[in-house]
Amino acid sequence: MTRATSIKDVDQHEATKSIAHFLKKSGKVKVPEWSDLVKLGVNKELAPVDPDWFYTRAASLARHLYFRPAGIGAFKKVYGGNKRRGVAPNHFQTSAGNCLRKAVQQLEKIKWVEKHPDGKGRILSKQGRKDLDRIATSLRSSGQQA
């Protein structure tokens, strides 16, 4: 008897890539038209190099919500970083909230994410958990064949 495979059982980088590929291939997630012009935070000097960064960020958010509920403010802290200020000491800056909010809204639109009943941010829905488990199972089976 084989035990069920969850997203916890596979490599996080491969899982995020596979989820992003699934989101792009499905065509249900719409990338905002401003996505090629935006930086991902005050602490960043340049815009993202990867043209599919929105799918990767949405996949990362979905994977994060698999483990625990979180809100946009928590995600801003997770994806934030040090702002380099020249000769002055670095200071922590949160990430850009609009990019995160739009990605979470797209995940809500495809029924992967729903609002927490107690108002504690967002949680992964049953449909989202089922799809992520299916992606993890396919990743694990392809890893065993290789």
UniProtKB/Swiss-Prot annotation:
It comes from the Eukaryota. One of its GO terms (biological process) is translation. SMART domains: Ribosomal_S19e (SM01413). The keyword Amino-acid biosynthesis does not apply. This is Small ribosomal subunit protein eS19. GO terms for molecular function: RNA binding; structural constituent of ribosome. Gene3D superfamilies: Winged helix-like DNA-binding domain superfamily/Winged helix DNA-binding domain (1.10.10.10). InterPro entries: Ribosomal_eS19, Ribosomal_eS19_CS, WH-like_DNA-bd_sf, WH_DNA-bd_sf. The lineage of its organism: Eukaryota, Metazoa, Ecdysozoa, Nematoda, Chromadorea. It comes from Caenorhabditis elegans. Belongs to the eukaryotic ribosomal protein eS19 family.
